[in-house]
């Protein structure tokens, strides 16, 4: 069995069906003896360019280990499902299980937002302290 990274984009009007689609696709892979190494739901995001007058899509990424038969069946499911507006399947040399750069960046962004929105400064530093230290030497 080979390793693959699969990304598919779902029409934004069908976002509520994403959970069922992912469940169906993972079941298809696992019934054939494959494994899901990583599953990430990136949510609705702006597209770089419009696809059939659609400007947003729901992104899902899977890292799987599966047979060629299961992959062909998955590709057929993507092709005949009108809700899937784009898909990309890349062969990988090994299983990838760590978090993707997309999710890492999103977590960093949310952490920065939380720190910025916090009313008190909990790290113990005071922005004005460095200025007063510099002025004390003069």
UniProtKB/Swiss-Prot annotation:
InterPro entries the record matches: Ribosomal_bS6 (IPR000529), Ribosomal_bS6_CS (IPR020815), Ribosomal_bS6_sf (IPR035980), Ribosomal_S6_plastid/chlpt (IPR020814), Transl_elong_EF1B/ribsomal_bS6 (IPR014717)
CDD domains cross-referenced by the UniProt entry: bS6
Region (Disordered): 97-138
Keywords noted in UniProt: Ribonucleoprotein, Ribosomal protein, RNA-binding, rRNA-binding
Record carries keyword rRNA-binding: yes
UniProt gene name: rpsF
Organism: Stutzerimonas stutzeri (strain A1501)
Superkingdom: Bacteria
Pfam families the UniProt entry points to: Ribosomal_S6
Annotated protein name in UniProt: Small ribosomal subunit protein bS6
Record keyword Coiled coil present: no
Top-level taxonomy: Bacteria, Pseudomonadati, Pseudomonadota, Gammaproteobacteria, Pseudomonadales
